[in-house]
C-alpha cells in the first residue's frame, strides 16, 4: 500500500502534485507496523495536507527568531529539507505587516517535514537542548492542521471538521503560544490559537479563538476550561455563533479568498474580529447573523452600576497628559470600534471616549490599559453613561428637595397668655374677685397705706421678701406708719422704732405660710 503525498509550495500559493519532488513519500506496508507512522496512516483514504502527520508544532521560540534561524536549528539536527511557517505579530488583513512595533514572532511556528517518518523522528527530540542556544529546549508536538499560505492564514478545510470556541478575559501579556499550549496539553485536536490584536498598536484586545478538529473535544473544552487561570486571570470560553464558521485570518480575521470577494460585508464588523468567516454559500447567513457573533456563558450578574451596566459604553481615561488633544485621543482609540464622542475636560488630566457598543469599550480598556500617550501611561476604567449621569443628577435633586422639606421654618414664640402692655399701670386686687384668692383662704384683706386725698391709691408698689432689707428700704414703703393698720401682723412681726417700722420678714413669712397666705406682707 503506497500513497503519493500532496506537496505545498508557498511561493506558488496553490497545491500541486509533484511525483519527482523531494517531498514525495512512499509508505510501504512494512511501515504500517511502525509506531512512528500511526498518525500518518489514520484516515488514509482522505490523505491531504495537514493530516498526513508530517507537520510539527514548534513552540517556545525566541521572539527574534525568523525562518532562517529555525532552518539552521533543524539543519544542525540533521533535518535540512524542511519548510517553516512562522507566525508573526502585527500582520494586517492584506497580509502585510504593520509599521508599528518590532518584527517579532508569536512564539511558535509550524515545521513541515518530507514525510511522517521524518516528523516522528524529529518529535523524539522534544525537550532536547537546541544547538548554539544553550538556554533553549525544543518544544515539539503534532500539528493537526496546516495553513494555506505563508501569510499566516488558515487553510480552507471542510467546515464539518473544524470547531472553534471564543476565549475572553485574556490578560494583556498572554501570547498565542501560551493560549495554544494551554489547550493542546489537554485536547490533542487543538489545531490553532488566535488572539485578536489591534492593527495600529499591535496590543492584544483581550480575546481570541481556539480551533479544534474534533467536535467532542471542543464541547469538553467549553465545559472544562471555563474559569481556568492563564497568566493570573480566569478566562471565559463560549461557542461561536455557528460551528461551521472558522478563523480565516491572523489579525481581526481576514476575508476568505473567494467567499468575501463578491460580498459587501460591513468593514466595521470585520475590523473587530467578532466572528469566524463562512465558506461556500453561507455568505448570506453570515451577513444576517453578524449582529450576534458570540454566545457568552450565562452568569449571575451583580447589581447594575456604571461598571456592570451592559449599556454603558463610556471609557474613562485617567493620567492623561495636558498636551493631548481630543483628535489625538480619538486616533488612539479609533481602532477598537466606532466612537460616538471624545471629551477632554479642561484642566482635569483625564478624558472620556464613548463607543457605539460595549464590546468595543471592553476591547479598548483591555488593549490600552497602561499604554503610553504623550509620555504618560494612561489608566482606563468605566465611565458613567449618559443615562447613569441623568439618574444621578435626578437623585441628587430629589434628595435636596426632601431635606429642605424636612427642615422646620422659623416660628414666632407662642405664649399661653396675652402679656400686658408695659404702659399700663398694675391694678390693685379686688377683694370681691374670687379668682384672686389663694387655695385655703376665704377672704384676703388688702390695705392701702398710700391712699391720698382723693381716695385713690398710689400705684407705685414694691414687694420685698429679702431678709437683708435695710430699715431705710422698709421705711420707704410706709408713707405714714402712724396711720397703718397693723392689727393683722401680730404685733411681734413689726417693730416700731420712732418713725421707722422694721418688718421681721423671716418670721412673718413663716407665719403667713402656715396660715395659708402668700408669704408676703402687703402694706
From Swiss-Prot:
Residues 1-35, 239-260 are annotated as: Disordered. Keywords: mRNA processing, mRNA splicing, Repeat, RNA-binding, Spliceosome. Gene3D superfamilies: 3.30.70.330. PANTHER family: TRNA SELENOCYSTEINE 1-ASSOCIATED PROTEIN 1-RELATED (PTHR47640:SF10), TRNA SELENOCYSTEINE 1-ASSOCIATED PROTEIN 1-RELATED-RELATED (PTHR47640). This is Protein NAM8. Disruption phenotype: Affects the meiotic recombination and the formation of viable spores. Residues 54-145, 163-242, 313-385 form the RRM domain. Component of the U1 small nuclear ribonucleoprotein complex (U1 snRNP). Component of the U1 small nuclear ribonucleoprotein complex (U1 snRNP) involved in the initiation of meiotic recombination. Involved in the formation of DSBs at recombination hot-spots through meiosis-specific splicing of REC107 pre-mRNA. Collaborates with MER1 to promote splicing of essential meiotic mRNAs REC10, AMA1, MER3, HFM1, SPO22 and PCH2. NAM8 interacts with the pre-mRNA downstream of the 5' splice site, in a region of non-conserved sequence and is required for efficient splicing of uncapped RNA precursor. The RNA binding domains RRM2 and RRM3 are required for NAM8 meiotic function. Within the U1 snRNP complex, the RRM2 domain of NAM8 is positioned to bind to the intronic region immediately down-stream of nucleotide +13. The gene is NAM8. It comes from Saccharomyces cerevisiae (strain ATCC 204508 / S288c). One of its GO terms (biological process) is mRNA splicing, via spliceosome. One of its GO terms (molecular function) is mRNA binding. It comes from the Eukaryota.
Amino acid at each position: 500500500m503506497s500513497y503519493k503525498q500532496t506537496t505545498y509550495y508557498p511561493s506558488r500559493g496553490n497545491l500541486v502534485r509533484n511525483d519527482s519532488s523531494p517531498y514525495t513519500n512512499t509508505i510501504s506496508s512494512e511501515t504500517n507496523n511502525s509506531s512512528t507512522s500511526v498518525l500518518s496512516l489514520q484516515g488514509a483514504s482522505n490523505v491531504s495536507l495537514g493530516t498526513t502527520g508530517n507537520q510539527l508544532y514548534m513552540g517556545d521560540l525566541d521572539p527574534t527568531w525568523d525562518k532562517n534561524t529555525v532552518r539552521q536549528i533543524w539543519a544542525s539536527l540533521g533535518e535540512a529539507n524542511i519548510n517553516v511557517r512562522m507566525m508573526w505579530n502585527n500582520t494586517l488583513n492584506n497580509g502585510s505587516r504593520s509599521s508599528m512595533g518590532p518584527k517579532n514572532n508569536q512564539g511558535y511556528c509550524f515545521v513541515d517535514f518530507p514525510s511522517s517518518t521524518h516528523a516522528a523522528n524529529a518529535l523524539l527530540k522534544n525537550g532536547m537542548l537546541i544547538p548554539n542556544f544553550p538556554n533553549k529546549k525544543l518544544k515539539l508536538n503534532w500539528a493537526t492542521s496546516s495553513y494555506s499560505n505563508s501569510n499566516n492564514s488558515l487553510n480552507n478545510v471542510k467546515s464539518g471538521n473544524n470547531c472553534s470556541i471564543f476565549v475572553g478575559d485574556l490578560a494583556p501579556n498572554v501570547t498565542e503560544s501560551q493560549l495554544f499550549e494551554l489547550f493542546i496539553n489537554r485536547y490533542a485536536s487543538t489545531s490553532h490559537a488566535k488572539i485578536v490584536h489591534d492593527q495600529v498598536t499591535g496590543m492584544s484586545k483581550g480575546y481570541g479563538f481556539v480551533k479544534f478538529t474534533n467536535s467532542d473535544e471542543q464541547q469538553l473544552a467549553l465545559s472544562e476550561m471555563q474559569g481556568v487561570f492563564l497568566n493570573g486571570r480566569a478566562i471565559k470560553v463560549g461557542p461561536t455563533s455557528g460551528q461551521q464558521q472558522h478563523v480565516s485570518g491572523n489579525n481581526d480575521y481576514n476575508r476568505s479568498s473567494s467567499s468575501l470577494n463578491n460580498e459587501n460585508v460591513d468593514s466595521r464588523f470585520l475590523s473587530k474580529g467578532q466572528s469566524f468567516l463562512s465558506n461556500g454559500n453561507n455568505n448570506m447567513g453570515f451577513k444576517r447573523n453578524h449582529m450576534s457573533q458570540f454566545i457568552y456563558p450565562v452568569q449571575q450578574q451583580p447589581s447594575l452600576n456604571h461598571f456592570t451596566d451592559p449599556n454603558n459604553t463610556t471609557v474613562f481615561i485617567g493620567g492623561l497628559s495636558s498636551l493631548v488633544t481630543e483628535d489625538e485621543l480619538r486616533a488612539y482609540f479609533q481602532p477598537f470600534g466606532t466612537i460616538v464622542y471624545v471629551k477632554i475636560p479642561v484642566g482635569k488630566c483625564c478624558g472620556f471616549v464613548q463607543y457605539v457598543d460595549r464590546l468595543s469599550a471592553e476591547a479598548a480598556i483591555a488593549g490600552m490599559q497602561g499604554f503610553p500617550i504623550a509620555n504618560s501611561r494612561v489608566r482606563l476604567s468605566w465611565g458613567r453613561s449618559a443615562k447613569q449621569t441623568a439618574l444621578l443628577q435626578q437623585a441628587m435633586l430629589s434628595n435636596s428637595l426632601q431635606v429642605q422639606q424636612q427642615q422646620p421654618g422659623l416660628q414666632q414664640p407662642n405664649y399661653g397668655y396675652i402679656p400686658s402692655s408695659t404702659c399700663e399701670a398694675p391694678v390693685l386686687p379686688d377683694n370681691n374677685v374670687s379668682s384672686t384668692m389663694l387655695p385655703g383662704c376665704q377672704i384676703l384683706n388688702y390695705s392701702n397705706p398710700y391712699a391720698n386725698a382723693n381716695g385713690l391709691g398710689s400705684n407705685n408698689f414694691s414687694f420685698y421678701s429679702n431678709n437683708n432689707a435695710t430699715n431705710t428700704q422698709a421705711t420707704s414703703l410706709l408713707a405714714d406708719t402712724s396711720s397703718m393698720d397693723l392689727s393683722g401682723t401680730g404685733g411681734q412681726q413689726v417693730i416700731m422704732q420712732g418713725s421707722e417700722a422694721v418688718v421681721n420678714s423671716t418670721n412673718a413669712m413663716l407665719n403667713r405660710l402656715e396660715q395659708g397666705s402668700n408669704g408676703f406682707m402687703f402694706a
